[in-house]
Amino acid sequence: MGKIIGIDLGTTNSCVAVVEGGNPKVIENAEGNRTTPSIIAYVEDGEILVGAPAKRQAVTNPKNTIYAAKRLIGRRFEDKEVQKDIDLMPFEILKAKNGDAWVKVRDQELAPPQISAEVLRKMKKAAEDYLGEEVTEAVITVPAYFNDSQRQATKDAGRIAGLEVKRIINEPTAAALAFGLAKQEGDRKIAVYDLGGGTFDVSIIEIADVDGEHQFEVLSTNGDTFLGGEDFDQRLIDYIVTEFKKEQGVDLKQDVMALQRLKEAAEKAKIELSSATQTEVNLPYITMDATGPKHLAMKITRAKFESLVDDLIARSIEPCRVALKDAGVSLSDITDVILVGGQTRMPKVQDAVKEFFGKEPRKDVNPDEAVAVGAAIQGSVLSGDRKDVLLLDVTPLSLGIETLGGVMTKLIQKNTTIPTKASQTFSTADDNQTAVTIHVLQGEREKAAANKSLGQFNLGDIPPAPRGIPQIEVEFNIDANGILHVSAKDKATGKQANITIQASSGLSEAEIERMVKDAEANAEEDKKLHELVTARNHAEGLIHSIKKSLGEHGDKIGADEKAKIESALKEAEEVVKGDDKEAIEAKAEELAKASQKLGEIMYAQAQAEAGAQGGAEQAEAGKKDEGNVVDAEFEEVKKDKA
């Protein structure tokens, strides 16, 4: 059985790990880095760039470079969070036919799972290169506060990338796994504060040794799926744009390329301010108007930046309070506070966490890698390699159905340990009603419309009867991925209807299949492109070396031979401009054959030179030896025999 890898599919950065010989290992990507920017670029020639190469070209290709796709995954176009992002993102977000938020790049309409699949594919490839074998299975992490649609969409992304997603687990839980197994510090209750690039989660987790088994039980979880490092960057961008407009009278928000440069600079400045008290944002030629080019140079102090994001940090504290209350634990019960996510490197965030929990957060957990490591550990548990770990996670939000009067009746309460199932019997609202619509909801509000609609289905052929008489049993079943399966059964007839919630939005099976095929076709295209580039590089290298050799030794071969080489060179130079791999390889071979005579002459000359040099060295060595002769007398020493 192959390895099950662990992938932290992040908003800003992603990471992949695997357990080898019982130890988790974070795998470096093709560029040699342990984390990969979750950035995807669609370039003009059809190539798709992922990670650092995509980030490098973002300034010149802002409309076709997608970042933070995770903020859109499993979301409706009408969601207020999506509407907010439409104004901030340089790329186009549009409403898909199913009502979801999709992205438009180069006349293609792409679903967020399709875009995220490109990042997952890069993670998969990194793992395959490291392990030297094909990888087909993965554990992928999601924010604990992701709803059902977002979890399902993440699973779809895995499928499109060619991965069987063995389990979706919550990021704070994964971080707790990494921490608990690395430290082995006995029974404890920990708080995991996870402030990533686009999402915030907090989980209260109990770690216990039960009969030699490490048990990780999530007591509660809370969070905000639209609060993260990207929002901190945006505050800094907004401030710089406002100040620049005051000074120069130019609105940088109207210049997409300038905004992209500013985004990169703001992210860099934010990171610098975690270790320095002041930094400078310096962007020459940021834009221009009728008076000429404009340069941006602005000093930002740590205190100023902290004042810009003060309310964002405060927003993360309320979920901590709720999580503690839901877990039924007090601050004094918390042994350790673990920080996860790159944004937790900000000193002000650390201070706020310390102030709330009353203790110094642990600094011995890598905030960028802990989640992927935990996912890899869970992968080793699922593959049977590790048998001493038990993970008990929870559903983050309550689940129920809409009932008479537009209210939500909860069947499963938030923070219930999963997998779990619950059922309740309902009846009809009208006389002689022959069908009921089961409208599935997720959330905490009493009013049905105020909660997240996960989907609906019908149960028909109910025998006519007065209202309140038919007995319809609705069963909710949440699997270990936190994904919901719902069934409804008429107790009188035994007739049943059921669905795996794909949300009223989400991708259909046919769409996923199409995207899987597209991805496979892309992989084939990528392979062909790689082969073409390799052939072209080989041919260009050959052309260069033969031109050089012809210049140095061309006078040593006959005119016919020289003309033959020059003709082959010309043909090869012409063909490398095209995209025909076979033609390039053929002309390179012809050139190599045509220049054989030249090669022989060069080889013979090199041998002659080496021989001459060797002879000279020997003669020189002989002379040196003559001058170093030492006269000595030898005396035989006889040992006395016993």
Curated annotation (Swiss-Prot):
Biased composition range(s): Low complexity: 608-619
GO molecular function terms listed in the Swiss-Prot or TrEMBL record: ATP binding; ATP-dependent protein folding chaperone; unfolded protein binding
Induction: By stress conditions e.g. heat shock.
Post-translational modification Phosphothreonine, affected residues: 199
Function noted in UniProt: Acts as a chaperone.
Region (Disordered): 608-642
Domain of life: Bacteria
Pfam families: HSP70 (PF00012)
Family: Belongs to the heat shock protein 70 family.
PANTHER family, per database record: HEAT SHOCK PROTEIN 70KDA (PTHR19375)
Record's keyword terms, sorted: ATP-binding, Chaperone, Nucleotide-binding, Phosphoprotein, Stress response
Entry keyword DNA-binding: no
Protein name, per record: Chaperone protein DnaK
